[in-house]
Amino acid sequence: VHRRGVGLVFQDNALFPHRDVEDNVAFGLRVAGVPVESRMRQVAEMLRLVGLDGFAARSVDTLSGGEAQRVALARALAPGPRLLLLDEPFGSLDRVLRDRLVGEVGGLLRALGQTALHVTHDRDEAFAIADRIAVLGKGRIQRIGTPAEVWAEPGTVYVARCLGHENLIELDSGGRCPLGRLAKGAGTVLVHGDRVVIGPSGDNSSPVGTVVESVFRGETTLVRIRVGDLVIGVPSTARVGVGSEVAVILEPGAVVPLD
């Protein structure tokens, strides 16, 4: 792999347990025949970039999970690879540490101008670190684009489900469902919950539904509303009690057709 100019970072970091931090980071440089003096300068710079100044002589057995992944990243970056492949690198870390490292690693890779391919099953992780996302399914790329593009227009039911969209609605031959006429004919559409407004039930121009669930999620509350035989989820900053009747108002761009 190193002969092809590819650096690798794995979920379990795969550090050499019999080597200290400095020797781990220097491994690729040593294989490439980089002279000792230059090698040590590059190792020191890599450790500085990943926030591990002063860790050179540390045994890898004494490192935390986050520190070990930083060492693995420094080792992969040290030889200056054409491509960096990260295979679920944060999967074994707790959520708080994972979120912090995702931001730091993404910023570092951009600062270095490093081309990277990051493999993950975590949607939020992909959105946070990627400039472009490819959603794979059945051995093929199902959708590719920026995080914003892929989220707004998944293209297919498969991709929408992979991304965690829950408002996937089947329309009849007239393009109708309990929310009204959403298309010209039969098919499946995505209704973006963040483009749905919950209003007073007295608004006769909009369908009226009943709140069947209200799930607190910190900054927002996920409100699930039953309209006829359909239930949709809407994030809301307002507290709406279960059993309340509300109008469901679709803003422009709320409805996206899917294949």
Residue ranges, per PLM feature:
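A short, proline-enriched helix->beta-strand linker immediately N-terminal to the Walker B motif
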Residues: 78-82
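Catalytic Walker B motif of ABC-type/P-loop ATPase nucleotide-binding domains
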Residues: 84-88
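ATPase nucleotide-binding modules
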Residues: 148, 152-212, 219-239
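Conserved ABC ATPase "signature" region
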Residues: 37-55, 106-107
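Conserved ABC ATPase signature
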Residues: 59-63, 67
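ABC ATPase NBD coupling module
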Residues: 1-7, 31, 36-41, 150, ...
